[in-house]
Regions:
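Short acidic capping loops at alpha-helix termini that bridge into adjacent secondary structure
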Residues: 68-72, 93, 204, 226-227
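PLP-dependent aminotransferase class I/II
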Residues: 28-30, 227-280
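N-terminal "arm"/small-domain region of PLP-dependent enzymes with the aminotransferase-like
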Residues: 1-48
Length: 280
């Protein structure tokens, strides 16, 4: 029996004139992307295997974000990387915000991860109380989390018991509420996650819609945050949902290697790679 489709953007099960379920740029594909895709049809892009390492796209993204190419991993949309991360790390216990993006939970359930929810309260406008979230992590991790990914052998040896969270997902801006968390608060959360050995995933896929995305992104700080994994996508801002293109930034190359080991080799099509470069 097939699993019922739960993501937004399902314009196929029923006729839809205006789709409010998927937050995609209503302006559509950029003109430069359209022109690049037309060139791809004339060239043998669709007739050959794509570069499994997305080298040209990775270089373009590294230049765009001013980071080393070794920190970047491209995927078949951000969802591909979410599932890849779950299968690579196989966390035992996770903390998710609610409401938030559904596919975090789906990916974690696929690896039999226990999930707790940190509820965003309607009376507070669904705003995240970072202080309380940090306290929740600390209470759950009265001792070091010995099964966490990315923690040192010395940290692992400091504890024999673990009741804490292996992984935490933060969507910023949050989907579906649109509520944001300033980078100073995200960095505070990252500091707590480092202390509790909780791997932090920060989904920044909607940040390009903000007036000042630099006030929220923690990408410039990744060099010192080996336990943080940032998700980005071309899906929303460039209206490329049908092409499927996302990417992750992480300074922990061991984590990126583990993800590559559990994924198919050609997860990003040649068309998507060329479109991504054109979009940048």
């Amino acid at each position: 029996m097939h699993t019922k489709y739960q993501h937004g953007g399902d314009i196929y099960s029923n006729k839809v004139s205006i789709d409010y379920s998927a937050n995609i740029n209503p302006l559509g594909l950029p003109q430069g992307v359209k022109e690049e895709l037309a060139r791809c049809i004339e060239e043998p892009v669709c007739c050959v295997y794509p570069d499994s390492q997305c080298r040209d796209l990775v270089k373009a993204l590294a230049d765009y974000h001013k980071v080393t190419q070794d920190w970047i991993l491209c995927g078949d949309g951000a969802a591909d990387l979410i599932f890849g991360l779950a299968f690579a790390l196989k966390p035992k216990k996770a903390l998710l915000l609610a409401p938030s993006f559904l596919e975090y939970e789906q990916a974690l359930k696929a690896v039999d991860c226990d999930i707790d929810l940190f509820y965003l309260k309607e009376e507070n406008g669904y705003r995240l109380d970072v202080e309380e979230l940090c306290k929740t992590l600390e209470r759950a991790n009265a001792t070091y989390n010995t099964t966490a990914v990315g923690c040192s052998d010395q940290q692992k040896s400091t504890s024999e018991a673990n009741n804490g969270y292996n992984i935490l997902f933060l969507c910023n801006p949050n989907n579906p509420t649109g509520i944001t968390v300033k980078k100073e608060q995200v960095l505070k959360l990252a500091e707590t996650c480092e202390k509790t050995n909780t791997f932090l995933v920060v989904d920044e896929c909607f940040e390009e819609f903000l007036d000042e995305p630099e006030a929220y992104s923690i990408i410039p700080f990744l060099e010192k945050l080996s336990h943080v994994f940032v998700l980005k996508a071309f899906t929303k801002i460039y209206a490329m949902a049908g092409l499927r293109l996302g990417y992750a930034l992480c300074s922990n190359e061991d984590v990126l290697t583990k993800i590559c080991q559990v994924r198919q080799p050609w997860s990003v099509s040649g068309l998507a790679q060329r479109a991504g470069i054109a979009a940048l």
